[in-house]
Amino acid sequence: MMTKNIRSAALLVFCLALAQQTMGHGSMTPEGDICILEIGYLKAHFKTYLPGSYGHEQFCETLPEASEAVFVMEYEHDSLAEMMIEFRIIRELTGKREFTREKDIKKIDDLESITVAYHPPQREPDVFSITHQFEDPGWYVGIITARTLALDETYVAVFPFEVGFTGYRYWPFVAFAIALLGSALYYDSRRERSA
């Protein structure tokens, strides 16, 4: 019975570690091999490229290194092509990292002082893109604001992302799960030999 509990615990820790990697951050949701950005009720395919080091490889919420990044948003809804789109990247200073939401951004008094990239509002038919040179690794927050011209409505997407992400913070969970599973198997084999 104890062995079954140990195995279950090891499996749970392992699954939680994997699930944490696949969770969407903020308005961004990984869906298969693409990322879907939700701007209010509107959706867009969102991808980031690091052309200098990774060529045409696409990234969603984590960029493996600080370098030139090209952010590309392809509209799923035609109405986005008619809206004024503003794009801002800020340093994540709330301490919430991947859990930063729009309400956290609204509490920041001086957004300009932590802005690292800004694309002023303008209409971009079909595809929106912005290029930014990241100098430092760390957590950042993308803020996309879409405004209708006729109805004066505003929709916002907030998505935290990490630059210089290597996946190292999940290894302790994986190592612990493997050690726990190994211990359970060792204990099981010793018990069977003595029986």
Q: What are the language-model segments listed below?
A:
Residues 1-10:
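Bacterial N-terminal signal peptides that target proteins for export
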